[in-house]
Each structure stands twice: as C-alpha cells, then as structure tokens.
Amino acid sequence: MKIDKIIQKMTLEDKIALCSGENFWETKKYEKYGIPSLFMCDGPHGLRKQEDAADMLGLNNSRPATCFPAEVTTAGSWDPELLAEIGAAIGREAKEQGVGLVLGPGANLKRNPLCGRNFEYFSEDPYLAGKLAAAFIRGAEAQGVGTSLKHFAANSQEYRRFTSNSVLDDRTLRELYLTAFEIAVKEGKPSTVMCAYPKLNGVHCSDSKALLTDILRTEWGFGGMVITDWGAMNDRIEGFRVGCDLSMPGGSDYMEKDVLQAVKDGTLPESCVDDSARRVLKLVFQATETLSQKAACDYEAHHTLAKRAAAEGAVLLKNEDGILPLKQNAKIAVIGAM
C-alpha cells in the first residue's frame, strides 16, 4: 500500500512533525516523500476560507461563500434530508475553493444558555442532534470532502473552556452527552472527529484513552482521524498513545521534541506515531484525489437552498388572535431603519 511505503521511508522526526499543522489551516507538505498538504477551514453553516492572514475568530476577510442558516435554525426543520442538502452544497463549495476538510458539524448538547456557541449546535435533544449531524456529514462526504464532527465531548460551555472540568457519571455521559456523537459516527461516518478543549472527568479530551480509544474507536468502530480543536492538545505524548492524531494549528515544535525523546527512550512505541501518521496521510491523499477533479458550483442554487432552509427552520410559537396568515388585502406598517 502506498501509505505504508511512505511511512517506511519517513524519518521519525518527519512522522512526528506530519502530525502537527504547518500553519493555521494546512497540514505539512513533504515533496521528498510525495506528500501534499491538506487545506481545511470552518464550515458548520458556510465555508470560511481565509487565503491571506488567518485568524481563529474570522475577523480577516474570507472568500465569498453561501451563508446557510446556523444549526440552531436548521434543527427547527426536523428534516435530515434538508441537512444532507446543505452538507452537499457546502461540500461542493469546498471542492470549488480547494478545501479538503470542512470543520463541522457541531453536535454538542445545548446545556448552558450562556454558551456563546450554541448557535453552532443543533439541539437540547441528543437524538435529533445526532440524526441531523449524520445527515450533514453524509451530504458533504458524498462530494468527496471530509468533515469534522465536533467538539468531542461534553463541551457545552465556553466559560473557561480551556481549563474547565466536566464531571459526569457514566449513565449521564452516555445517554445525554455522547448520544449525538455516537449516532453521527455510526450513521454519518465522518472522516474526522475533533476533540474538545475541556477536561472530561479530570482528563483532557486530547489525552483521554476512555474517550478516544475505548469509546470512539473500540466501541463505535471509528477508523478515521482525530484532530484537536485549535490549541487543545495538552500532552502530545499521551495524545499519540490514545490516538489523537493531528494537533492544530501547529507552529511550535516543543511538543515534537518531547515525543521524539519519548520514542527514543522507549516510553512511547513508535507504532503509535505510525498509526497517527497513517491516518493523517489517508485523509490527505483522499482530499488530494477529490480536489484534482474539476468542481462546478451553482451559487445561485445554493442561495435558494439557504432561503428555503431559513423558512423551514422558522417555528411559530404563538399565533395570538389568529393574526397569521396575513390577509391578502391587509395593510401592514414597517417601522424603523433598515
């Protein structure tokens, strides 16, 4: 197999380095091994490809793309087929813009109303969230573009997200906080899963054997790549050991030096590095093949889809005095600045 032959040729240093990003949005390219880079970007409800100065908050300019309603709206449709259409449309735009991995969808449970990223998540209902996430994934992956199911797991608040500790008994964890991810992994089959910032029961998600090895890979049968949220890697040695494959965004080699020493002194098997490098390469070559094909993209059709999704996601909570639907000949007043 091509990937195995490449891994055999690579130095240990290069294999370790491959598993960290080259910059904010790309993996490392190694011409001497025939390894291209992979470009990824945010995209739960629309592509956000930054070609110049990159930043996590999206403050700098991005290439134009269709802005679909966020998951908080599309969940109101209760329509997996609609989410599959949106996923497919974002996948087509990703191909047209040279993006091999879309960082979405988000499947975290809405627990805290103060969570600033609730708009990225579908629902308080883990079953609904899982079904819609799976549909989005199927739609995008059918275009040959990878997806990243996030943020795994129990990342339901933003306050102190880098240091917080989600303490959960096993039943609560599995019945509520893991259910959406389990459905999405088994039914959607995403190319990647993104691990979250916080600790889960005292262990950082990027270091968690229980989460990444025992549950995700062994119980659920996930065979894809695990990527960190940006800056979420805690212990790179333990990350390799438990199957946390790609550390993003990269840019620093201090963790790589620790891994190199750990392999040399025998505390980390080199096979752990090989396994992660293999999963990174599999995704890189899949994306390269997809992006080598010409991609046509009908943005007007996507705008129409976005409008339909917004309408289908709108939910009427109260119709006081039967005012809706509006009478055809009635007059209305629109007041205020536009």
Predicted regions span which residues?
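Glycoside hydrolase catalytic-domain context in secreted enzymes
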Residues: 1-338
